[in-house]
Regions:
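Glycine-rich, phosphate-binding/catalytic loops in enzymes
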Residues: 23, 52, 109-113
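Catalytic-site signature of metal-activated, phosphate-bearing donor transferases
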Residues: 71-79, 100-293
């Protein structure tokens, strides 16, 4: 069984993405790892090279800044990395620059790839998600945030990244997947308040038709945490590769203030109760077809 990892990244230093931690968290499972490196204004290239692994292959790309519809440029860059994977790879393990896998899940993930290799009805493996929010000490649960997504796919070029690279499709249909008992830890919203404000501003250029607003970046250090429907204390351990970042944290999160400012409607509160009692997320968007779990 041959496994290829792949990701895309641009301006990782400027945007404080833990891309080195992301790559190294799954590198031991991979025989090769493709990094689609977009033209950057910082030291991202050296950051990747400093991982110093013969498994890593960098392909240099230029982001199409005319693609401003719903983050579609992220899917285009993902597809560039996927296309560069060696044709003899069986599985392709995708990870984004703000995601990590805890080392405790690696044996299970490897076994799932081995056990499902011969089952052609399984086109991908579906992971559970934990979204850390504002701090490494808290994670967020919300109906507006995806709780599962495909991160391992067959190395079949009929597959392509979908929408803003959240998931994948086989041509135009949903991929048939097995849900596995492993989590992706998503750290994209773990930043000091000013960093979160800047992230929202920078992301706008890839989701809004007109790109960046004409106004300068917001001067405020206050971030609106109102979309955190429920913040829960994280009582487990983080991936070992993340520990250095966690030790360097220099801000405090006022969870009590966030609780007071929550903007959870009565309808969402009711639907959350239904999910808590039954496990059923009413109206959940599913960019996949679960055929095995």
């Amino acid at each position: 069984m041959k496994v290829a990892g792949f990701t895309f990244i641009r301006n990782a230093v400027k945007n404080d993405y833990p891309v080195v931690e992301s790559i190294t968290s799954i590198l031991s499972l991979c025989d090769e790892f493709i990094v689609a490196l977009g033209k950057s204004d910082d030291e991202t290239e050296q950051l990747i090279k400093n991982i110093n692994s013969p498994k890593i292959k960098i392909i240099y790309t230029e982001w199409d800044k005319s693609l401003k519809n719903g983050g579609s440029v992220f899917a285009v860059e993902t597809d560039k990395a996927f296309a560069a994977i060696s044709p003899d790879a069986d599985w392709a393990f995708y990870i984004q620059g703000d995601e990590c896998v805890h080392e405790k899940y690696l044996p299970l993930i490897k076994k799932e790839m081995e056990d499902n290799l011969a089952d052609k009805n399984i086109e991908g493996l579906l992971f559970k998600y934990m979204h850390f929010y504002g701090s490494y000490d808290y994670y967020c649960e919300s109906r507006r945030w995806y709780r599962r997504e495909i991160r391992i796919i067959r190395n079949n070029k009929n597959i392509h990244s979908y929408r803003d690279a959240q998931g994948f499709r086989w041509n135009d249909r949903k991929i048939k997947v097995k849900l596995i008992d492993a989590y992706i830890y998503h750290y994209g919203w773990v930043k000091p308040p000013k960093g979160l404000v800047n992230k929202g501003y920078n992301f706008n250029q890839f989701y809004a038709e007109n790109g960046h607003p004409t106004d300068p970046p917001p001067a405020t250090d206050e971030f609106d945490y109102g979309n955190a429907d429920r913040m829960l204390r994280f009582k487990d351990t983080h991936p070992a590769v993340m520990q250095k970042r966690i030790d360097a944290v220099n801000w405090n999160l006022d969870v009590n203030k966030i609780e007071k400012n929550k903007k959870m409607s009565a309808r969402r509160r009711f639907l959350q109760v239904v999910e808590d009692l039954t496990g059923w997320r009413v109206g959940e968007y599913k960019n996949y077809e679960i055929v095995k779990q």
